Curated annotation (Swiss-Prot):
EC code: 2.5.1.7
Family: Belongs to the EPSP synthase family. MurA subfamily.
Transmembrane segments annotated in the record for this chain: none
Organism encoding this protein: Helicobacter pylori (strain ATCC 700392 / 26695) (Campylobacter pylori)
Sites of 2-(S-cysteinyl)pyruvic acid O-phosphothioketal modification: 117
Top class in the EC scheme: transferase
BP-aspect Gene Ontology terms: cell division; cell wall organization; peptidoglycan biosynthetic process; regulation of cell shape; UDP-N-acetylgalactosamine biosynthetic process
InterPro entries: Enolpyruvate_Tfrase_dom (IPR001986), Enolpyruvate_Tfrase_sf (IPR036968), MurA_subfamily (IPR050068), RNA3'P_cycl/enolpyr_Trfase_a/b (IPR013792), UDP_GlcNAc_COvinyl_MurA (IPR005750)
Protein name: UDP-N-acetylglucosamine 1-carboxyvinyltransferase
Catalysed reactions, semicolon-separated: phosphoenolpyruvate + UDP-N-acetyl-alpha-D-glucosamine = UDP-N-acetyl-3-O-(1-carboxyvinyl)-alpha-D-glucosamine + phosphate
Xref: SUPFAM superfamilies: EPT/RTPC-like
Pathway(s) annotated for this protein in UniProt: Cell wall biogenesis; peptidoglycan biosynthesis
Alphabetized UniProt keyword annotations: Cell cycle, Cell division, Cell shape, Cell wall biogenesis/degradation, Cytoplasm, Peptidoglycan synthesis, Pyruvate, Transferase
Length: 422
């Protein structure tokens, strides 16, 4: 198992190229199961979750060819398998995204209940109810979801009691081959949803209301779609993380290959803290702040402040003057990084879903353990400003969502080494 050894308090400067968005790539990979013709997907990040989804598609009978490290050609014309097995699905929760396309195209499928994420309860109930609204019969048998719609899916209203990104994505993919019109009410509004909609539209699906909380889909009355090639949008969470690298080290960094509009909740907060940002069409440059002020954050669905940036801002709060307050409203158990930040010297108190951070605090290098994907990046951020050497263990979490993180940070001047546990 690998760990990162990080020498703290090293000056940083330079530019970072942002990779394609993992959270856009995963549903788009799943959606290729709907396609009769081969599809080329560009700007795929080389991260563990993408490789796991590619392996799952291959296991279902899709043909895969990597044209270069970030471009994959997928052919799902002659799929011969509609069972997503536990061995593959347990590796990540996003595997549930194959449920909608498999059911829509083949009228029956078996999908293992997912694993792969340590952040509280992320129930699949919303996905199952959405499929039932479209006419599917669902049973849970020996840890598998067995979904059937012998006569095909039929358009209907799907009302989500709670906003769900993957639930919205699964409903969209299922509705794309359903007869008639489907309305998804209380839909998620993330940019990744908008890109999935554009991908489905390329195959002839009519979708209205993109970017709003109500989506209207007219399915293609056929047994498959003819989807077109697509380039994955830049990863707004990776971009936000590197902005936080600049912010926590108080360095001048330029973040390239981004869509600034997708980052507004993050950039607004950085400006409030005291940073000067030069925002261009596809880049943001962060300049050192004279004084970093404490702040308050409440995580919300897009376009609110993203829960996936909460941990990084908790690390940043340790270097801000005053008392910062972070309220997590979307997931339980999402403060597991707090105790590890405390090992580095952070002054953090927790009360249910609210964290209070007192700063500014001098952090000291230590051994810390990553507990989930975004927590791992928060520990790397803190280690960059800690006095001495830190070792971040269990970085397989980090590898799920960040492409070549140590290479990108080292290119800025950092001293980060990936080593093997003894």
């Amino acid at each position: 198992m690998d760990f990162l050894e990080i020498v703290g308090q090293v000056p940083l400067k330079g530019e970072v190229e942002i990779s394609g968005a993992k959270n856009s790539a995963l549903p788009i990979l799943a959606a290729t199961l709907l396609s009769r013709q081969e599809v080329k997907i560009k700007s795929l990040p080389q991260v563990v979750d993408i490789k796991a989804m590619a392996l799952l598609l291959q296991n279902l009978g899709a043909s895969l060819e990597w044209l270069n490290p970030n471009t994959l050609q997928i052919g799902a014309k002659s799929l011969n398998h509609t069972e997503a097995t536990y061995d593959l699905v347990r590796k990540m929760r996003a595997s549930i995204l194959v449920l909608g396309p498999l059911l829509a195209r083949f009228k029956e499928c078996l999908v293992s209940l997912p694993g792969g994420c340590a952040i509280g309860a992320r129930p699949v109930d919303l996905h199952l109810k959405a499929m039932q609204q479209l006419g599917a019969k669902i049973t849970i048998e020996q840890g598998y979801i067995h979904a059937k719609a012998p006569k095909g899916l039929k358009g209907n209203d799907i009302l989500f009691d709670k906003i769900s990104v993957t639930g919205t994505e699964n409903a969209l993919m299922a509705a794309s081959l359903a007869k008639g019109i489907t309305r998804i009410i209380n839909a998620a509004k993330e940019p990744e949803i908008a890109q999935l909609c554009a991908f489905l539209q390329s195959g002839g699906v009519e979708i209205h209301g993109i970017g709003s909380s109500e989506l209207k889909i007219r399915g293609v009355e056929n047994d498959a779609l003819n989807l077109k090639d697509i380039q994955i949008i830049p990863d707004r969470i990776e971009a936000g993380t590197y902005l936080c690298v600049g912010a926590i080290t108080n360095s001048q960094l330029k973040i390239n290959h981004i869509i600034p509009n997708h980052l507004q909740a993050i950039t607004d907060k950085l400006i409030e803290i005291g940073f000067s940002l030069d925002i261009q069409e596809n880049s943001i440059e962060i300049h050192p702040a004279k004084k970093r002020q404490a702040f308050e954050i409440t995580t919300k669905e897009y376009p609110g402040f993203p829960t996936d940036m909460q941990a990084q801002f908790m690390a940043l709060a340790t270097q801000c003057l005053g008392t910062s307050v972070i309220e997590e409203t979307l997931f339980e158990n999402r403060f597991m990084h707090a105790s590890e930040l405390q090992r580095l010297g952070a002054n953090i108190s927790l009360k249910t879903n609210v964290a209070t951070i007192s700063g500014s605090t001098e952090l000291t290098g230590s051994d810390v353990m990553a507990t989930d994907l975004r927590a791992s990046s928060a520990l790397v951020l803190a280690a960059l400003v800690a006095k001495g050497v830190s070792r971040v263990h269990r970085i397989y979490h980090l590898d799920r969502g960040y492409e070549r993180l140590e290479d990108k940070i080292n290119a800025l001047g950092a001293k980060v080494a990936r080593l093997k546990e003894k």
